[in-house]
Swiss-Prot record:
Subcellular locations according to the entry: Cytoplasm, Nucleoid
PANTHER family, sorted: RECOMBINATION-ASSOCIATED PROTEIN RDGC
Keyword annotations from UniProtKB, A to Z: Cytoplasm, DNA recombination
GO cellular component: cytoplasm; nucleoid
HAMAP family documented for this protein: RdgC
Superkingdom of the source species: Bacteria
Protein name: Recombination-associated protein RdgC
Natural source organism: Neisseria meningitidis serogroup A / serotype 4A (strain DSM 15465 / Z2491)
InterPro entries according to UniProt: RdgC
Family under the similarity heading: Belongs to the RdgC family.
Main location: cytoplasm
């Protein structure tokens, strides 16, 4: 229930849907399995295992999930069958098979195999924080995060969400913190970072499980490299990697949050309810604090 990586989008709090409206809209775009010659199918599914509902509400938060099912048809299988058919035509009809005919045979083979192909599925979850006005997506890859945002917009007929563009870049802030050897406010340096240089061949330095205030680490910044990823700890509650794209990776929710969730959840539903609220609230407050050190939002 705890997101291990996060992309987020600021929302217009005044125009967020109620839980029942959101559920009705998502029902019109509910997931169905791949059929016939479809290569994939995508739609909304239940975000929690103990309920069939498409929205899991917890106080000021709403959890949703987008599921994608894709057919798996290895190119090698198609190639082997195609070679057999081409050889059969050449032997039986004593003629060569041209490029156009090979393409037609390949398409026919694909159509024959597709209904019987294996499938693989994936899902992307998101939580609406209606109190703070954020959509938190459980994926740091921009393509995955933007896809569920697009599907939500399509289902709702629009959703006012924007990219997290701040006046100062995350890379600039991270570079400054590493150079001065400490962070501001409730943030502390952890033990991992990534730095990049400039030039035709961009040098990349990855530091893992080291003291980030050590001279050999700081020297990379003094030599002109900028920080693109930085390990941070926030108020002894959350450890994470901040990226230059303002996404969060390798998130760890420390004992104080885990124990609070467990103390408020007596069963699967109760634990999910408490975890969702604590995660959304703590992450959102942390993001707002980060935004303040980044100079606020771009106008």
């Amino acid at each position: 229930m705890w997101f291990k990586q996060i992309s987020f989008y600021p929302l217009n709090k005044e125009k967020l849907p109620e839980a029942d409206v959101l559920a009705d809209k998502l029902a019109e775009a509910e997931f169905t399995h791949c059929q016939g010659l479809d290569w994939f199918s995508e739609g909304f599914t239940a975000p929690v295992s103990f309920s069939p509902e498409l929205v899991f509400p917890a106080d000021f938060t709403l959890r949703v999930a987008l599921k994608k099912e894709e057919k798996v048809l290895p190119a090698g299988v198609i190639r082997d069958i195609l070679e057999e058919k081409v050889a059969e035509i050449q032997n039986n009809e004593a003629r060569n098979v041209g490029r156009k005919e090979k393409q037609e045979l390949k398409e026919q083979i694909t159509d024959d195999l597709l209904p019987r192909a294996f499938t693989r599925s994936s899902r992307t979850e998101a939580v609406f924080n209606t109190r703070h006005g954020y959509l938190l997506v459980n994926n740091a890859a921009s393509a995955k995060a933007e896809n569920i945002l697009t599907k939500l917009r399509e289902a709702l007929g629009g959703l006012e969400a924007s990219l997290p563009n701040t006046k100062q870049s995350p890379s600039s802030l991270m570079t400054g913190w590493l150079l001065q050897g400490h962070c501001e406010g409730g943030f502390e340096l952890d033990s991992d970072c990534e730095l990049k240089g400039t030039g035709d061949i961009v040098p990349v330095v990855k530091v893992s499980k080291q003291d980030l205030t050590a001279d050999e680490v700081v020297q990379h910044v003094k030599n002109g490299k900028t920080v693109t990823q930085l390990g941070l700890v926030w108020r002894e509650q959350i450890a994470f990697i901040l990226t230059q794209d303002f996404t969060l990776k390798r998130i760890q929710y420390l004992d104080v949050l885990q124990e609070e969730a467990e103390s408020n959840g007596d069963d699967a539903a109760g634990l999910a309810f408490a975890s969702q609220i604590l995660m959304a609230e703590s992450v959102s407050i942390m993001l707002e604090e980060l935004v303040s050190y980044l100079g606020g939002w771009q106008d």
